[in-house]
Design a protein with these regions (language model features):
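Short acidic/His/Gly/Ser-rich catalytic and metal-binding motifs that mark active-site loops
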Residues: 8, 14-18, 89-91, 160-165
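Active-site glycine- and acidic-residue-rich loops that bind
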Residues: 59-63, 130-140
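Cap/insert and terminal regions of metallo-dependent hydrolase folds
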Residues: 25-34, 147-231
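Conserved beta-strand hairpin/beta-sheet module of binuclear metal-dependent hydrolase folds
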Residues: 1-34, 38, 141-156
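Metallo-beta-lactamase
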Residues: 27-41, 45-57, 74-131, 136, ...
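Active-site metal-binding loops of divalent metal-dependent hydrolases
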Residues: 10-13, 54, 85-86, 134-136, ...
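Metal-dependent catalytic neighborhoods of phosphoester/phosphodiester hydrolases
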Residues: 59-70, 209-212
Length: 231
């Protein structure tokens, strides 16, 4: 409707300790605020934050420490969106995912009163979502119509172009065999309907098109959002 500025996932953030970050090969010099500034926005401009899921590398940037050292939402004017079943899943984590669901990323949002739940496939945000359960319970994949194209925010169903082959799944998947099935069905539809995939974890391939090959669905072309749609 032209009145919303929607952010999908927020990355790691910067509130964790140096020891925490030392376990991960962080790449690049941008943080969320500098990236927003580059795009001409401020964190206060964000009206909605959609979490594909609540693993720390997807939602950590939603929370900051204030001057008193307390946790608070980084986007004071935003509504935060998740799936109700996934939110509960993250609050009562299984042993496999407990280290990925950090209370400091979850509870401050709930306590802020800014939390909203996606109730069905068509959200009031103006785009569809696909629900996937292989990586984690009720992962959301936003499906966005833009300039005549369908863009799917592939999140951790297909985090990089290297994960396009059906058997290549993430070690973090809680139900890897289900991921195989979900990927197979999704990629079949994606190539048939000429979807573009936005790859959240791929430093080399931001936006990709797909093609059928003898070995299955593979990368066709790689683009940046700016070059494909214009800045």
């Amino acid at each position: 409707d032209g009145k919303r500025l929607i952010l999908i996932d927020t990355g790691l953030g910067n509130k964790q300790s140096e020891k925490f970050f030392s376990h991960y090969a962080l790449w690049g010099h941008f943080d969320l605020n500098s990236s927003l500034k580059k795009a001409g926005f401020h964190s206060d401009d964000i009206t909605d934050v959609v979490f594909t899921h609540l693993h720390f590398d997807h939602c950590g940037g939603a929370i900051v420490r204030n001057k008193k050292g307390f946790y608070e939402p980084a986007f004071k004017n935003a509504r935060f969106w998740s799936h109700k079943d996934h939110w509960q899943w993250a609050k009562e984590p299984n042993m496999r995912e407990a280290a990925s669901f950090l209370p400091e990323n979850i509870l401050p949002i709930e306590e802020s009163g800014q939390l909203n739940f996606v109730k069905n496939a068509m959200t009031e945000l103006g785009f569809d979502v696909l629900l996937m359960d292989g990586h984690t319970e009720k992962q959301l994949l936003p499906v966005i119509q833009y300039k005549g194209k369908t863009i799917v925010f592939a999140a951790d169903l297909i985090p990089t172009a290297g994960h396009l082959p059906i058997p290549y799944v993430m070690g973090y998947d809680t139900r890897p065999l289900l991921t195989l099935s979900e990927k197979k069905g999704f990629l079949s539809t994606a190539v048939k309907e000429d979807y573009l995939l936005f790859l959240e974890h791929d430093a080399e391939n931001e936006l990709i098109s797909l093609k059928n090959t003898e070995k299955g669905v593979r990368l066709d072309q790689s683009f940046s959002l700016d070059t494909y749609f214009g800045s």
